[in-house]
Amino acid sequence: MLTEEMLSYIQESTEDIRQLIRELCAIPAPSHHEEKRAEYCKAWFEANGFADVQIDEALNVVCRYQVTDDNDLVVFMAHTDTVFPDTEPMPFREDEKKMYAPGVCDDTANLAVLMVCARYFVQRKKQAKCGVLFVANSCEEGLGNLKGSRRIVQDYGSRIREFYTFDGTDLRRVVTSAVGSHRYRVTVRTEGGHSYGAFGNRNAIYYLSSMIDTIYTMKVPQKEGAKTTYNVGVIEGGTSVNTIAQEASMLCEYRSNDRECLETMRTFFEKIFETYRAMGVEVEAELVGERPCSGDVPQEKWDALIARADSAVREILGAEPLHGPSSTDANIPLAAGIPAICTSAAVGRGCHTRQEEIDLDALPDGARLSMRLMQDYFED
């Protein structure tokens, strides 16, 4: 149960959270280019009493609290990148009830809540039960390929006993399994030519279209408890209206929360690529993203972590938690056998659209929920 001191702190810090969101939203942070937002976060942490803060090679801002050379660790993270490629500040506005901006919920508001909640424990020099890493991590979105989370697990994996990531739009949500994915950039090349003079030559757009049509004939594997999907998200190609296309490409993916189903999809896609190569068409299939499913996590420890999150949701919100699979920064620790969950510290909608928004009235509950999860790792 949160103490009166914690509750008062959250009430007093609500405007701090809002101001952090405003300032972070003004700093563009596309995946792989989070430098400016990382520098801002590092400066904020240092100005607010964090003594051991560094930006690693993956552009993670890592705040180490009471970390020794060999003690066990817990990780709390929220990502700095947004799904949008913009390198100039994006439109931001607010009214009495909401803030509106691309990326404002995913994951800026979650990050702001993490930062302010972490400040409570650090400024009061609370004794931790283990080492704590507060991380503003990079590259969660899209082709960021979970680079930031991978680096944390690479650097600290054997010492991490539990792992939390704050992401999402519903405070009741507890992500309890990892959705893995493979993402390809597929390029088809043919001889092409002039649309009149070389009529009859092979057209790369035609063969790519045919390949896409073949993909969409697949029936995904059916397995109890598993969900498997596929998608072609981007197609490009051609030169002009009077040119037989020499080159066309697509970005495609498949996903599943089951490792066997994911491998079934890999086999199917690879067979498609080989089929078109056998037609004499050049097919280049580049794996541009790979997110793993859950690995062999000790079930008893994982169940205990989920139970604590469920208890916090019931205590703070008076609501039942919503369990489900998702693709988040938690994929990486789960694949490594580390108990991990993803919860939300914000309520919003329109994620991954230019109309994204958050509910301001939900921020205090998001902070209370996040602080309740952190509280278990500190002495009373």
Where do the PLM segments sit?
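Metal-dependent amide/peptide-bond hydrolase catalytic core
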Residues: M1-E5, R185, R189, G193-D380
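Acidic/histidine-rich catalytic neighborhood of metal-dependent amide-processing enzymes
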Residues: D107-V179, E253, F378
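Buried hydrophobic packing segments
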Residues: C41, L111-F121, I152, L208-M211, ...
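N-terminal capping segment at the start of a domain
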Residues: M1-E35, G348-H352
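Short beta-strand segments
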Residues: M77-A78, V135-N137, F163-D167, T187-R189, ...
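A non-catalytic alpha/beta surface segment that caps or lines the substrate-entry region
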Residues: L20-E23, A29-N71, P91-R93
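Acidic-glycine-rich active-site phosphate/pyrophosphate-binding loop
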Residues: T80-D95, I160, S177-T187, I341-C342, ...
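Active-site metal-coordination/substrate-binding segment of hydrolases
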Residues: D70-A136, Y156, D365
